[in-house]
């Protein structure tokens, strides 16, 4: 698992180098995205998805009419949390040993980047789908 996460981390580092060749000048890093995949920040985003659905269930009699707002609100809340943590966090440069290791092995970074994005999107779809099913169940009661 650690090796898999290192591959995704390396892919994001290469992606970042391609789009930001002059280094970080403040702002966000693609490394944050892989941290969100592999750490507690994704758990926080999931918890806020559940809280958002409960708010809709509490304040609206027919929450299904507003289900399309749930992913949008979750994304906004998740971005605010991510913004807070990224500004608070001390940036770390990409691990040169990992980069050198994967350069030697010739691993295609784009494939791993695609897998990372796919896993992230799939997990968000699962959360959103679960919330919509929850709302539909409560709507029928």
Walk through the language-model features, giving the residues of each.
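Membrane-proximal soluble regions of multi-pass membrane proteins
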Residues: 1-29
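Loop-to-transmembrane boundary segments
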Residues: 23-41, 103-127
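Long protein-protein interaction modules used by eukaryotic assembly/scaffold proteins
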Residues: 73, 77-78, 90-99, 121-127
């Amino acid at each position: 698992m650690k090796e898999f996460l290192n591959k995704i981390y390396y892919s994001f580092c290469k992606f970042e180098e391609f789009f930001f060749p002059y280094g970080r000048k403040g702002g966000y890093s693609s490394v944050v995205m892989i941290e969100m995949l592999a750490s507690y920040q994704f758990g926080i985003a999931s918890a806020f998805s559940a809280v958002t659905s409960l708010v809709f269930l509490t304040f609206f009699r027919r929450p299904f009419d507003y289900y399309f707002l749930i992913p949008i609100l979750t994304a906004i809340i998740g971005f605010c949390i991510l913004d807070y943590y990224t500004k608070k966090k001390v940036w770390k440069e990409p691990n040169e040993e990992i980069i050198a290791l994967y350069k030697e092995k010739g691993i295609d970074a784009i494939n791993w980047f695609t897998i990372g994005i796919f896993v992230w999107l799939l997990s968000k779809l699962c959360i959103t789908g679960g919330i919509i099913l929850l709302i539909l169940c409560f709507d029928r009661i």
